[in-house]
Amino acid sequence: MSETRFDLIVIGAGPGGYVAAIRAAQLGMSVACVEKRTTLGGTCLNVGCIPSKALLNASEHYADAAGGGLGELGIELGSVKLDLPKMMRGKDKIVDSLTTGIDFLFKKNKVTRLQGAARIDGAGKVTVTDGADAGSYEAERILIATGSHASSLPGIEIDEARIVSSTGAL
């Protein structure tokens, strides 16, 4: 990474962050976007809204086929089998397609992607750690778009075995 100074550094590449980064670049700003994941899109795209909806959609199709719901439409099926590993691969394919699309938009709009965890060290100063683009960066403006993460209830630990978060479920 040769460039270390930008008009704007966006911290977080979820739906708010990546859209803001792309729009700022379209308006003529030099923009970097820091994301701790190796893929863009944030929680929603990687382990939240999108993959859960993909699995829900597949599950609804299975339920219609297995439960005879298609019979009302004149469609009769023999035995119906659920292939969970294949369903998960389908979900992964959808997520990969969308994250690749955001990558393409970053390149098309000349948004610099910085992989790692961001820390604001002062006015206009951002340090990126724990990633491929670790280093010090400067910007006229910093936009924080870090999104959310799962929280547990007091006294109830998310162990991802018996009590799972949305991330663990996917």
Tell me what each language-model feature is.
Residues S2-G14:
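Beta1/beta-strand and adjacent pyrophosphate-binding region of the FAD-binding site
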Residues E3-F6, I22-L170:
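Glycine-rich flavin
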Residues G17:
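N-terminal Rossmann-fold NAD(P) dinucleotide-binding loop
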